[in-house]
Amino acid sequence: MAAPSEAPERRRPFGRRFLTDPTRLFQHNAWDNVEWSEEQEATAKSKVQENSSQLLPQDKQEEYEVNAKRYWDDFYKIHENGFFKDRHWLFTEFPELAPNRNPSQNEDSLCEFSCKEVSKNEGLGSCENGHCTLENRAENQLNLLKSSPRFCTEELAPQKLKQSYEDYPGSSASYRILEVGCGAGNTVFPILQTNNDPGLFVYCCDFSTTAVDLVQSNVEYDSSRCFAFVHDLCNDQSPFPMPDESLDIVILIFVLSAILPEKMQCVINKLSRLLKPGGMILLRDYGRYDLAQLRFKKGQCLSANFYVRGDGTRVYFFTQDELDDLFTRAGLQKIQNLVDRRLQVNRGKQMTMYRVWIQCKYQKPAGPQL
């Protein structure tokens, strides 16, 4: 099959609200596709240079890596399921999550995408000292993973893992979705509510045991349609409950940014192996010079564009080219890679907040490339 055609780089707007008259700035809470001036970008670069001029000592950086799981567990113990809003806007941006849904539903739902939603990056944190709590049926993957390379190279290893799964959660499903870094279920449950395909099965995993417990204890958790499990993406001995080439969609929403940059390529390689030919990875994450990056102070920078928050969780701020390189090195083809520059407004305080997010869709080739 021929390679998929690239979607135009100029995106369909999240909403249809554009600031054409500056005098109307405080009439709404958010404005879409806001272009930055050269002066504004220069100011942002200057702030990043300033807050990254003093890096944390290496021993402190190693401490945040080793204890990453504990920091995310603590986060979910404190906030439980009350920190993030359910992401009903996802179906506007990623219709692949509910292919049969009426596209007119929630057309402007991203206006609900509040600062609170992205004030903390979602998901799994770093990947050291994590553990897996899968059912015994997934244990047969351990021996296969132990024999695979411990460290990944720049390019995706050409060989595939040979797997034999007779029965696994969702084995009879016709459409399988995996969300990585599921948190308390703010993506999973909207998918289960919106996508009524009887052949749908949704997997969701998180680095935090506490987060997975929150998903499994939710009254909407239905084990006949969903399987939640603890998973450490960066640990080669942490198994998945499904075989390679079994997934239609992998979702990464504010998750990749929480991983140590040196480990990101290995993570994307690992996830790409799970995709069926024609399957896609859907990503939304922090972009370079987002307000959250500019607000960091000296002494919070770990490495270039990688920071630690006050609670010990970490976050990276991407460029489009960096993400494109990660995905294409994993053998995936670009369908979408765009920047969403959003101007959010606090009308009460007369404040403006410039947000920068990147949204991507990358697809596994549907057949051998000739």
Curated annotation (Swiss-Prot):
InterPro entries xrefs:
Methyltransf_12, METTL2/6/8-like, SAM-dependent_MTases_sf
Recite the UniProt keywords alphabetically. Answer: Cytoplasm, Methyltransferase, S-adenosyl-L-methionine, Transferase, tRNA processing
Which catalytic reaction applies to this protein? Answer: cytidine(32) in tRNA(Thr) + S-adenosyl-L-methionine = N(3)-methylcytidine(32) in tRNA(Thr) + S-adenosyl-L-homocysteine + H(+); cytidine(32) in tRNA(Arg)(CCU) + S-adenosyl-L-methionine = N(3)-methylcytidine(32) in tRNA(Arg)(CCU) + S-adenosyl-L-homocysteine + H(+)
Keyword tRNA processing included in the entry's annotation: yes
| Pfam families in UniProt | Methyltransf_12
Q: Classify the source by domain of life.
A: Eukaryota
Q: List the subcellular locations.
A: Cytoplasm
Q: Which GO terms describe its cellular component?
A: cytoplasm
- Example GO BP: tRNA methylation
Please give the family membership noted in the entry: Belongs to the methyltransferase superfamily. METL family.
What does the function comment of this entry state? S-adenosyl-L-methionine-dependent methyltransferase that mediates N(3)-methylcytidine modification of residue 32 of the tRNA anticodon loop of tRNA(Thr)(UGU) and tRNA(Arg)(CCU). N(3)-methylcytidine methylation by METTL2 requires the N6-threonylcarbamoylation of tRNA (t6A37) by the EKC/KEOPS complex as prerequisite.
Assembly and interaction partners: Monomer.
Annotated protein name in UniProt: tRNA N(3)-cytidine methyltransferase METTL2
Gene behind this chain? METTL2
